[in-house]
From Swiss-Prot:
This is one of the proteins that bind and probably mediate the attachment of the 5S RNA into the large ribosomal subunit, where it forms part of the central protuberance. The keyword Signal does not apply. Part of the 50S ribosomal subunit; part of the 5S rRNA/L5/L18/L25 subcomplex. Contacts the 5S and 23S rRNAs. One of its GO terms (molecular function) is 5S rRNA binding. InterPro entries: Ribosomal_uL18_bac-type (IPR004389), Ribosomal_uL18_bac/euk (IPR005484). The keyword Cytoplasm does not apply. This is Large ribosomal subunit protein uL18. Belongs to the universal ribosomal protein uL18 family. GO terms for biological process: translation. One of its GO terms (cellular component) is cytosolic large ribosomal subunit. Keywords: Ribonucleoprotein, Ribosomal protein, RNA-binding, rRNA-binding. HAMAP family: Ribosomal_uL18_B.
């Protein structure tokens, strides 16, 4: 099993458990250059809020889009947008990525901005 298959396996297991709970999910995906965050409805069919370093508004504030500062900016943006829509509680879905570095920076910034998880 290669590294990507192992990550997808971990993500699938976590998502199955979150689906049983029926929770709104804050999903994170990262690539070497960018990081993406989405708040997905409990049924999994609707994206309620999204933010990423690809967006012009966020990317203009950053020197480089693949570091912890960029992840924190995305976390803050997604939390603010979620709070505007009345979403305060979410479950954190790290998509099989290790809770470290950019993933942790995004989560911490979202918590500081007011999301609860």
């Amino acid at each position: 099993m290669d590294k990507k298959a192992a990550r997808i396996r971990r993500a699938t297991r976590a998502r199955r458990k979150l689906k049983e709970l029926g929770a709104t999910r804050l999903v994170v995906h990262r690539t070497p250059r960018h990081i993406y965050a989405q708040v997905i409805a409990p049924n999994g069919s609707e994206i309620l809020v999204a933010a990423s370093t690809v967006e012009k508004a966020i990317n203009e504030q950053l020197k480089y889009a693949g570091n912890k500062d960029a992840a924190a900016a995305v976390g803050k943006a997604v939390a603010e947008r979620a709070l505007e829509k009345g979403i305060t509680k979410v479950s954190f879905d790290r998509s099989g990525f290790q809770y470290h570095g950019r993933v942790q920076a995004l989560a911490d910034a979202a918590r500081e901005a007011g999301l609860q998880f």
